[in-house]
């Protein structure tokens, strides 16, 4: 009986997909919710899925895209545990707020409350949770958070990934009294990642996952200096509609 892991995927691709050259493997890291998009450990393959050797066997034969869940991580991630306990690394990796003042304009993709209350010996107040209370948003106003993810990007590229999908990247930067989506600082970070990728690993591909109106979506191409590709969520159903 086949198991749902990287070994099975490797067999399937070899057996049935030899004419394909590109594969997107959805998050295969330890996760606590949201179908893998609440990452507990960015550098570990979930034991149920295999290990990095299994991944490298696939990436040696196919161009592989992996998800970089960059806006948030799991509340079970060691970084968030360190944040709650004022330990390092992570003590200042998340958005710590006293109240919801200035947040009335924030765009909400989910129906859960934006802020999650925290109470520990070291920290009291609220943290920012765009998608769920198990997915805590990271604070990109802290340069250490950006450096952390640049190291993760290097690790993924070194492990054989060709393309990186920046998940929920439109929500990355937060400012009070704004919609907190598609802010200029977010585009600056995408440009920086593009610049570093094309210099460190020429030929690698950066893709933004932005489920937003078309004009705003297209802005993530920048001036040919942001994403190489962008997701067009409306295209797939429109193609099906055209066929039927």
Question: What is the meaning of each model-derived region?
Answer:
Residues 164-168:
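Extended, hydrophobic alpha-helical segments in both membrane/secreted and soluble proteins
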Residues 228:
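Catalytic metal-binding acidic patch
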Residues 1-150, 154, 158, 169-224, ...:
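Acidic/aromatic-lined carbohydrate-recognition and catalytic surfaces
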């Amino acid at each position: 009986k086949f198991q749902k892991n990287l070994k099975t995927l490797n067999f399937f691709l070899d057996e049935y997909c030899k004419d394909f050259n590109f594969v997107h493997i959805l998050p295969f890291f330890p996760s606590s919710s949201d179908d893998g998009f609440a990452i507990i450990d960015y550098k570990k393959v979930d034991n149920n899925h295999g290990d990095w050797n299994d991944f490298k066997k696939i990436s040696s034969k196919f161009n592989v895209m992996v998800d970089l869940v960059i806006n948030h991580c799991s509340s079970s991630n060691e970084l968030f545990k360190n944040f709650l306990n004022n330990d390092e690394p992570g003590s200042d990796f998340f958005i710590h707020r006293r109240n919801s003042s200035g947040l009335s304009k924030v765009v909400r993709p989910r129906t859960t409350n934006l802020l999650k209350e925290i109470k520990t010996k070291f920290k009291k107040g609220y943290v920012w949770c765009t998608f769920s209370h198990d997915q805590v948003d990271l604070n990109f106003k802290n340069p250490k958070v950006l450096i952390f993810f640049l190291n993760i990007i290097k690790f993924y590229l070194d492990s054989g990934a060709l393309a990186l999908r920046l998940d929920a990247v439109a929500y990355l930067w937060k400012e009070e009294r704004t919609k907190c989506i598609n802010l200029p600082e977010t585009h600056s970070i995408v440009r920086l990642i593009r610049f570093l990728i094309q210099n460190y690993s020429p030929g690698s591909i950066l893709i933004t996952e932005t489920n937003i109106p078309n004009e705003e979506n297209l802005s993530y191409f920048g001036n040919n200096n942001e994403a190489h590709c962008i997701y067009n969520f409306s295209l797939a159903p429109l193609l099906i509609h055209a066929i039927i």
